[in-house]
């Protein structure tokens, strides 16, 4: 403990004073004797010999610690234990003063750093761009026409909107990103619906396949069905033709007349006489004559 206190005192700076006697005023008496000259004491005024004492204190920063040390030395008689206690008190005072100075220096350093950071933040903080309705409408129209701008278009649009070219460029970048994100969401929803439809169709096909397999591997019907009478064979198909009828041939009716009546054979197989005429010629529809 005494070594640590001495180390603190050596860091803070110490002053060593020499005095005679048990109190702190020995130094003053010695100085007065030095100014008055060296006088040999008379035998009648002999007093007990004075013991020299050392006082360790701070130079100017810890006057209170030095005063406390001097008071303790004057009252204690300057023994070894008392010297150790005096050093401890002085070391504590020096450590307190040093701690206070360090805290003040740290506080000033932190405050200056914070002030510099605030200044940097104020100078480099990006403020959000606030556009009017007219500016937003004009930017949207230009974006519908062209999603990207070349440097000349960018500068011209920035002058028209009273903005910086960098602000216009950033707005177009953000707008393209939002458009791409919306399109991605739409595509995702469409693909999700397609996936659900395909999944349902796959399930339906699986059910149909299972039903077909069940019908294919189904057991045969019971044997009692073999004794049942077999159904009658289907009746043969017959086509009924119409009956043969005699019809008048329009061609023969045109060519036939009184001049050729003698040559026409009657339907009953007899020839017609001179005074007998045949008015109509009947024929079978299934036999075609050359005249027809």
Curated annotation (Swiss-Prot):
Top-level taxonomic group: Eukaryota
Residue numbers spanned by region Disordered: 14-85, 99-133, 217-236
Keyword field: DNA-binding, Homeobox, Nucleus, Transcription, Transcription regulation
Gene3D superfamilies with a match to the protein in the record: Homeodomain-like (1.10.10.60)
The keyword Cell membrane is assigned to this record: no
Tissue expression per record: Expressed in seedlings, roots, stems, leaf sheaths and blades and panicles.
Residue ranges of the region described as Leucine-zipper: 182-226
Single Gene Ontology MF annotation: sequence-specific DNA binding
Compartments in which it is found: Nucleus
Entry-linked Pfam families: HALZ, Homeodomain
Matching InterPro entries: HD, HD-ZIP_Homeobox_LZ_Class_II, Homeobox_CS, Homeodomain-like_sf, Leu_zip_homeo
Induction annotation: In leaves by drought stress.
Cellular component annotations (GO), alphabetically ordered: nucleus
Biased composition (Basic and acidic residues): 99-109
Main location: nucleus
Keyword Ligase set for record: no
DNA-binding segment(s): 124-183
Compositionally biased region (Low complexity): 28-74
Function: Probable transcription factor.
UniProt family annotation: Belongs to the HD-ZIP homeobox family. Class II subfamily.
Protein name: Homeobox-leucine zipper protein HOX19
Source organism of this protein record: Oryza sativa subsp. indica (Rice)
Origin organism lineage: Eukaryota, Viridiplantae, Streptophyta, Embryophyta, Tracheophyta
């Amino acid at each position: 403990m005494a070594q640590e206190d001495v180390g603190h005192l050596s860091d803070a700076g110490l002053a060593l004073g020499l005095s005679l006697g048990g109190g702190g005023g020995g130094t003053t008496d010695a100085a007065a004797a030095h100014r008055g000259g060296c006088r040999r004491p008379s035998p009648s005024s002999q007093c007990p010999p004075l013991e020299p004492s050392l006082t360790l204190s701070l130079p100017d920063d810890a006057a209170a610690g030095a005063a406390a040390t001097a008071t303790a030395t004057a009252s204690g008689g300057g023994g070894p234990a008392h010297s150790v206690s005096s050093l401890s008190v002085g070391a504590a005072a020096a450590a307190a003063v040093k701690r206070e100075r360090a805290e003040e220096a740290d506080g000033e350093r932190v405050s200056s750093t914070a002030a510099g950071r605030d200044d940097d933040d104020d100078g480099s903080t990006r403020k959000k761009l606030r556009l009017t309705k007219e500016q937003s409408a004009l930017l949207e129209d230009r974006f519908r026409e062209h999603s990207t701008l070349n440097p000349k278009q960018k500068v011209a649009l920035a002058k028209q909107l009273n903005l910086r070219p960098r602000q216009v460029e950033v707005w177009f970048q953000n707008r393209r990103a939002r458009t791409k994100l919306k399109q991605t969401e739409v595509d995702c929803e469409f693909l999700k619906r397609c996936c659900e439809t395909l999944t349902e169709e796959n399930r339906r096909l699986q059910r149909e396949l299972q039903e077909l397999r069940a019908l294919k591997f189904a057991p045969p019907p019971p044997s009692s069905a073999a004794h049942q009478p077999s159904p009658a064979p289907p009746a043969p198909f017959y086509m009924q033709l119409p009956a043969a009828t005699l019809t008048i041939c329009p061609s023969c009716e045109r060519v036939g007349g009184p001049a050729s009546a003698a040559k026409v054979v009657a339907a009953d197989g007899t020839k017609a006489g001179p005074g007998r005429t045949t008015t109509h010629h009947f024929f079978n529809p299934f036999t075609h004559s050359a005249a027809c």
